Regions:
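Cytosolic regulatory regions built on CNB/CRP/Popeye-like sensor folds
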Residues: 1-164
Length: 164
């Protein structure tokens, strides 16, 4: 089981805050409340953050490094997308409450900020308004990712090179 530590260096989050879309629209006080729930973990290049079929446990934000999204079918893995600093992932499985449908692997040594399912549920109980803002932002992020996937499919249909 991966170790997670409390996020103590909040300044490191502030430097990438503009890239973290699901934290948009919250006040400083609300953001500080969210920051208290965040943890951090490191992953070496090639290490899996989460695997297809596992129960989702966290929403991840990339603080340093790059993460690849891999889709697999019968032992064939295809890189669907690469995520960079400030990007979040893991929210689809977490919100849909289904096991992971893809795997995420560190493309280079990476540091991830994480929001656990337990912390998200605690936020729902403690501050429903902040919880609702986060859920709306995550839904918006998922809609963007769905559009990205639609674009990939459309380009594939037309034989256009797809940039990951």
């Amino acid at each position: 089981m991966k170790e997670y530590s409390p996020l103590k260096d909040l300044d490191s989050v502030m430097s990438i805050l503009s890239k973290i879309s699901f934290l948009g629209g919250v006040s400083d006080a609300q953001r500080n409340k969210i920051f208290q729930l965040l943890e951090i973990s490191s992953f070496k290049k090639g290490e899996y953050v989460s695997r297809k079929g596992e129960e989702p446990s966290h929403i991840y934000i990339i603080r340093k490094g790059k993460i690849e999204l891999l889709i697999t079918d019968n032992k064939v893995a295809v890189k669907k997308r690469e995520f960079n600093v400030g990007a979040c992932f893991g929210e689809a499985a977490m919100l849909s409450m289904i096991n992971n449908t893809a795997s995420f692997v560190a493309a280079e040594d990476s540091e991830l900020i994480v929001l656990s399912r337990r912390a998200l549920n605690r936020l729902r109980q403690d501050d429903i308004n902040v919880f609702c803002i986060l859920i709306m932002n995550l839904a918006r992020e998922l809609a963007r990712k769905l559009q990205y996937t639609d674009d990939i499919l459309l380009k594939h249909e037309h034989g256009t090179k797809v940039e990951l």
